[in-house]
């Protein structure tokens, strides 16, 4: 028997036995691939996924740590600013207090110096008055003696005459 050669579209369609044997080989290769290669691929993929997840977790933890450090730094910075402002205000208050104390002491010292100078002036004034009374008295006695032509020897008379002349001079001022 002679077989007829295929023609037309039949040239491209395989025979049934070719399809069956191809399917059997495909199933064997798929089972072999599924049994031996897939677990290794899955292990590698799982390992990479775990590594990626670990890196993501590490990055997330690092971000949280950075946020916490930033918050802590900002809190410390805020506290430092508050402390600096408090120190500045305290220094200003202390400076005002020191200035007020220095001013008070200067005013007190000036008042003491003024009072001391006033007392000194008053003392010198009294000394000048006493000295002038003595000199005026001596001059008045000498003048009265020349006018009267006699020397006034009685101390009581001299004193009363000196006092009356000084009073007359004081009244004329």
From Swiss-Prot:
The keyword Transferase does not apply. One of its GO terms (cellular component) is plasma membrane. One of its GO terms (molecular function) is proton-transporting ATPase activity, rotational mechanism. F-type ATPases have 2 components, F(1) - the catalytic core - and F(0) - the membrane proton channel. F(1) has five subunits: alpha(3), beta(3), gamma(1), delta(1), epsilon(1). F(0) has three main subunits: a(1), b(2) and c(10-14). The alpha and beta chains form an alternating ring which encloses part of the gamma chain. F(1) is attached to F(0) by a central stalk formed by the gamma and epsilon chains, while a peripheral stalk is formed by the delta and b chains. The chain crosses the membrane at residues 19-39. This is ATP synthase subunit b. F(1)F(0) ATP synthase produces ATP from ADP in the presence of a proton or sodium gradient. F-type ATPases consist of two structural domains, F(1) containing the extramembraneous catalytic core and F(0) containing the membrane proton channel, linked together by a central stalk and a peripheral stalk. During catalysis, ATP synthesis in the catalytic domain of F(1) is coupled via a rotary mechanism of the central stalk subunits to proton translocation. Component of the F(0) channel, it forms part of the peripheral stalk, linking F(1) to F(0). It is a single-pass membrane protein. It is found in: Cell membrane. Disulfide bonds: none annotated. Belongs to the ATPase B chain family. Keywords: ATP synthesis, Cell membrane, CF(0), Hydrogen ion transport, Ion transport, Membrane, Transmembrane, Transmembrane helix, Transport.
């Amino acid at each position: 028997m002679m077989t007829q050669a295929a023609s037309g579209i039949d040239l491209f369609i395989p025979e049934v036995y070719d399809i069956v044997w191809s399917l059997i080989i495909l199933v064997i290769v798929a089972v072999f691939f599924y049994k031996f290669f897939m677990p290794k691929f899955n292990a590698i993929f799982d390992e990479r996924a775990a590594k990626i997840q670990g890196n993501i977790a590490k990055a997330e933890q690092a971000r949280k740590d950075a946020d916490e450090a930033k918050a802590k730094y900002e809190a410390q910075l805020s506290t430092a600013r508050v402390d600096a402002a408090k120190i500045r205000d305290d220094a200003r208050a202390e400076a005002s207090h020191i200035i007020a104390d220095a001013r008070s002491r200067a005013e007190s010292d000036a008042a003491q110096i003024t009072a001391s100078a006033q007392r000194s002036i008053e003392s010198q004034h009294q000394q000048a008055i006493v000295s002038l009374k003595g000199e005026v008295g001596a001059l008045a006695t000498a003048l009265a003696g020349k006018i009267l032509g006699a020397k006034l020897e009685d101390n009581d008379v001299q004193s009363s005459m000196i006092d009356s002349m000084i009073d007359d001079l004081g009244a004329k001022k």
